[in-house]
Amino acid sequence: VLLRRKILALGLAAAALGQANEPAKPLVATTPRVPAVGIELPGDARAQLRERTDALGQAIDALARQHVDTPPLLHHLPDVQVYHKAVDWALKHRIFFKPSELKTAGELLVEGRERAAQLAKGKTPWTRATGLVVRGYVSRLDDSVQPYGLVIPPSVSTDPWRKRRLDIWLHGRDDKLSELKFIQQRHTSAGQFTPPDTIVLHPYGRFCNAFKFAGEMDVLEALAHAKTQYPVDGNRVSIRGFSMGGAGCWHLGTHFAGDWVAVAPGAGFAESLEYLGLTRKNAMPPAYEQTLWGLYDATKYAGNLFNTATVAYSGEIDKQRQAANIMERHLTAEGLALHHVIGPDTGHKYHPAAKAEIDDRVNAVAAKGRNPVPAEVRLVTQTLRYNRQGWVQVDGLETHWKPARVKARLTSEKRVEVATDNVSRLVLSMPSGLCPLRPNGNPTVVIDGDELTGARIRTDRSWEALFVNALGRWRAVGRFKFAGLAKRPGLQGPIDDAFINRFLMVRPTGPALSPMADKWTAAQLGQALSDWELQFRAKPLVKDDNDITDADIADCNLILWGDPQSNSTIARVIDQLPLGWSETTVQLGQAVAESATHAPMLIYPNPLNPKRYIVLNSGFTFSRFGHMSNATQTPKLPDWALVDMRRPYNAGDPTCIAAAGFFNERWQLPMPE
């Protein structure tokens, strides 16, 4: 357990922890709004734009009613809604940043009205258009409509069924990149690279987060949606980007390496510690936050690039060359030699000759395609959130946030050899038609020297074999059995993990245990709702505690605000949480504090549905860092924390965190050392 002993030591009486004479300040730490407030629009122009925007909204409502019984047409409604949202939210959030964006807003409303009129007639011509196309989808996270852009090659119009290569392009940092500006760019610019006969996908990434957290999910959801709409060859999907997009490319490239035919980052950053110069600045965060760099640091996942082709780019005199340099060091340690293209005497941009070389190399790799079942797969991870490469999947770790490794090789048509470290549950899985193992008999699987009989190959030429490591010995099993709770993929924490799947904010309706808790909860909930709307471009799903249904419990991570007295859902589960919470004290393991002045935050499997999370009293944790470098946008809290309500809350400020730590692999508080 990692404790910040601001208030207590083991055995210290809780009454000694709180200082009753200290003034209550249940406030959120003040930081610049992200995105910033834009220019003031002329009153008449704003009123006219609002009227036209509302008219499009009414047309969309009418379309929803009209096509309620025709799902194929209703599925195209987001293609209209993205235009309405772009202008509506620019007005609502006051994020017009220059006068010319008034004209842009008008143009987007015209396009939205045109699509609405076409959809009313049962027509969707934009779905067959070539060139620059804007599409929309509904996110599973929060039911929000999110835009993405496409470059559709002319060949699609004459040969629409042939599967094609798709390149994902991740945009650079722009803390003024509203939906309005993004869609305008996607109407007017094809981007840096447009290879022939290739679909190019431009994700919005939910604003400016380096394609992490919900931004990561936006890339994956946009890709999944595009695959349902266009002839995409799943073995020829590459990921590319520059600057912040280069950082996103390093992240998504290493964490999902086996999914890409090529990874081509330019500039950006690949980790937080060296890029931010924290050691040099003597600005190291708490130990638990440093541990959580193991979630997104691409350097810690460099070994996964064994599973794909990588072409990196840097300008010779670009400070962000640091990203490729540090990745090169880590790849060398993995036995891999990074191909690093340098733009001579070039700063933060592509050099023309280097750009041409990158294109040639990526084109050559993409032409060959990705091997979906390679003879050898390597996996490196520190968390079950990122647990798969190719046909290798890790379903259990011995210890989270320490390196776990798998090296798996097909050594013959009836033998697989695997070496692991820090792995407790392993799955080897190959899809239909692709298993190269001999179809009759059982393959031999050797794991860390233990020779085992694997499951038989199925007649559709698929294969799945499960293995468990118990007390240092591996054995084959038919299915994983869990006696009680265990960390598993998608249920492993930290707190931020709850916000990359569908979640529901649950408001308290009763009085809290203390007046301070009432005020603090209201402030934190309000800030969390605002932060998600502004920084992740969606209104969170919200319900009162007494309105929660069985369907909500089945489908959503529940973000519970308040305490057992104010929130009836917390009261339902409190006895099954590793938490003591009374009128006088709140306790997590060794950490004890007065409930009048302290609140718990935690993530835990929902006792009402252990396939989903509950979270207590927290939104995403980096919100106070949204205006800073994207490299600071990392998780600020682990699995649990006790927070001092008397201080302005900022998850990244250790002075307001009384104690914090991780649950073990059984979702238990570790024993004292």
Over which residues does each language-model region extend?
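Active-site machinery of serine-nucleophile hydrolases
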Residues: 161-230, 599
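C-terminal catalytic histidine-bearing segment of alpha/beta-hydrolase fold enzymes
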Residues: 313, 317-423
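A domain-start/cap signature at the N-terminus of enzymes
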Residues: 21-39, 93-164
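Mobile cap/lid helix-loop segments that gate and shape the active-site cleft of serine hydrolases
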Residues: 174-185, 258-303, 307-308
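Solvent-exposed alpha-helical segments and adjacent loops
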Residues: 429-673
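Amphipathic, heptad-repeat alpha-helical segments
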Residues: 22-80
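Gly/Ser-rich "nucleophile elbow"/oxyanion-hole loop immediately N-terminal to the catalytic nucleophile
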Residues: 155-162, 211-244, 254-260, 304
